[in-house]
Amino acid sequence: MKEILLAENSGFCFGVKQAMEKTEKEIEKKQRNESAGALYTWGPLIHNQTVTDALRAQGVRIAENLDEVTAEDTLIVRSHGEARAFFEEADRRGIHVVDATCPFVKKIHDLVEEAYGKGYRIIILGDAQHPEVRGINGWCENSALVVPTAEAA
């Protein structure tokens, strides 16, 4: 008979757990009528269809464009984070944003912004189309060299 072992550290990472907790708090506010408008996540909160379906069943919508969200709505930024320009545009539109960016990712944003401000060239190892990489690149005005491997750098 085959045995299935569950890894001791399985499940959501810290950043995703935090994003889920913030989303649950926002759902509770909606249920208590403490916030007007709809509740959105910016893209799927996590890459897990079961979780996405469960959130949708609780009234959470997925936004892919800021034009979908009004100033009465709440928009949750997933743990991947977003570029500075995204936050500035949401603020300009008066959209209430709940930033669920993973603290580790936010630290990278801060380091990139600081280094870029000092004139350093930013190099990011990763998939240029991945939301986390796009978000990081957005903290240096999308000027980073994005390469898939250290060898390519």
Question: Which functions belong to the PLM regions below?
Answer:
Residues 1-153:
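The feature marks the mature, well-folded catalytic cores of soluble enzymes
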